Amino acid sequence: AYVTGLKNLLDALNGQSLRHLFFISSTSVYAQDDDSWVDENSATEPARFSGQLVLAGEQVAIESGHPATVIRFSGIYGPSRQRFLEEVIAGRMDPQSPAPFSNRIHEEDAAEAAAYLIRQSLAGRQLEPRYIASDCEPVRLDEVVRWVQQQTPCAEPTPDARKGGRAGSKRCANTRLLATGFTFRYPDFRAGYRPMIDDLTG
């Protein structure tokens, strides 16, 4: 879908010009596993097939001949994406310690980041070809789990509890996005998960 779908869309334009093309991508294009910070200029050498497809889609967008911007979202969470929170409360998440770094963005901030950049383009402002959209605090997964356990009663981890998230350990820098003037409603996991915990347990 990332490659074929975009190519089909561009073909359907039949030579019509776009004011600006936005491609929704993912930080899965980064394969770093050494706790390092990554930004829009960092190496993209995804080992997983899904990350390779996303990166190929990015290239189609950038080389489309239209003004284009790629937005690389980290893990999206929120009221409609609360599996992780439910797993911690139910004892189905028990990461190693220290765990790999994790990166996330609340679904409201994700939607607003895309809308904000679109508005910037419509206002005639020059956009960069790539932006990382991730909140302001990369954090080790076990720290997030411990914090949730401190906020609400959680079941003891089960023997088959998951030990972690996806492979890799990197810290995604959102400096370029912040430089546009964008502000996060949920700048870290605490701000985002606290109301979700209240809704789940209230």
PLM ranges: what are they?
Residues 1-22, 56:
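NAD(P)-cofactor binding segment of oxidoreductase domains
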Residues 20-23, 69-75, 132:
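Structural signature of the Rossmann-like NAD(P)-dependent dehydrogenase/reductase core
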Residues 24-37, 43-46, 76-80:
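Conserved catalytic-site region of short-chain dehydrogenase/reductase
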Residues 34-70, 97:
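Catalytic helix-loop patch of NAD(P)-dependent Rossmann-fold dehydrogenases
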Residues 70, 76, 82-86, 96-118:
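Substrate-positioning beta->alpha
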Residues 85-97, 154-158:
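A short C-terminal helix-loop "cap" of Rossmann-like NAD(P)-dependent dehydrogenase/epimerase domains
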Residues 111-113, 120-165:
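Mid/C-terminal beta-alpha module of Rossmann-like enzyme folds, strongest
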Residues 165-202:
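C-terminal amphipathic/interface module of NAD(P)-dependent oxidoreductases
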